[in-house]
């Protein structure tokens, strides 16, 4: 069966002694899991779609595709940056980090959507099969997951509260908990904007890939609110590209 083949492949990977090679193979393995299963690959929805039946791949087909895709990506990156010191971690909480000794030219991110989707749950199967996540680790991950409902009782910046107040008042009519979660999301994004602003060089740019949402029948112009917060911090909004 596919599950048996996945476990056999994982067993072979576990026997690799070189840590870098093993890490790369585990990444390729993790990315190969969903195409083999009935889970959706291009969606983070934690359920199986009955409307659009999925054509699955064999373990070999999926792993070979994943391996080649990641090898191509890492080769491309290596052509721009070489050496063991090519990557420098500057924090593990996107809403709370500071590095006065680090200066960057450009930051690019695609933050979570405001709908509080449990991203940790969506990657839990891959993490479990790779042996790098359990319930305790998942719980800790959710504590620092921007936009997660666990952060809805955090202390909110007054400026953020004022910006989101019109939407907050409409959402709370339907669900006060969701309204607080949305408010906490923008508070997290405000903190992230502040952190990134402080590590950007003069003239540096921050590119954010984000989508607007409708929460409890209330349309939220997420990109406009983030832009307004960024402007108050000191950023200059040079435009946006919108597509449907």
Outline where the language-model segments fall.
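SAM-dependent methyltransferase catalytic-core segment centered on the flexible catalytic loop
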Residues: 114-195
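Helix-to-beta-strand junctions that scaffold the AdoMet/dcAdoMet cofactor pocket
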Residues: 200-202
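Short glycine-centered segments of the SAM/dcSAM-binding site in methyltransferase folds
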Residues: 24, 204-205
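SAM-dependent nucleic-acid methyltransferase catalytic core
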Residues: 2-109, 114-121
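Acceptor-substrate binding/catalytic loop of class I
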Residues: 123, 178-187, 209-224
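Flexible loop/turn segments at secondary-structure boundaries
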Residues: 96-97, 115-117, 214-218, 244
């Amino acid at each position: 069966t596919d599950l048996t083949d996945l476990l056999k492949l994982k067993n072979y990977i576990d026997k690799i002694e070189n840590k870098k090679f093993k890490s790369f193979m585990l990444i390729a393995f993790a990315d190969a899991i969903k195409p083999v299963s009935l889970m959706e690959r291009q969606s983070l929805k934690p359920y199986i779609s009955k409307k659009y039946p999925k054509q699955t791949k064999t373990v070999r087909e999926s792993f070979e595709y994943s391996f080649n895709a990641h090898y191509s990506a890492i080769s491309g990156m290596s052509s721009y940056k070489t050496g063991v010191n090519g990557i420098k971690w500057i924090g593990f909480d996107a809403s709370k980090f500071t590095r006065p000794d680090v200066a960057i030219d450009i930051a690019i991110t695609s933050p979570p959507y405001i709908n509080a989707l449990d991203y940790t749950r969506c990657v839990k199967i891959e993490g479990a099969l790779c042996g790098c996540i359990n319930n305790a680790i998942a719980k800790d991950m959710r504590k620092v997951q921007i936009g997660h409902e666990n952060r809805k009782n955090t202390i909110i910046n007054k400026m953020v509260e004022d910006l989101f107040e019109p939407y907050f008042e409409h959402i709370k009519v339907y669900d006060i908990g969701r309204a607080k979660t949305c408010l906490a999301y923008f508070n997290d994004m405000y903190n992230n904007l502040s952190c990134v602003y402080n590590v950007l060089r003069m003239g540096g740019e921050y590119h954010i890939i984000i989508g607007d949402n409708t929460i409890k029948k209330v349309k939220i112009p997420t990109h406009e609110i983030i832009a307004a917060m960024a402007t108050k911090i000191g950023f200059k909004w040079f435009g946006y590209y919108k597509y449907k």
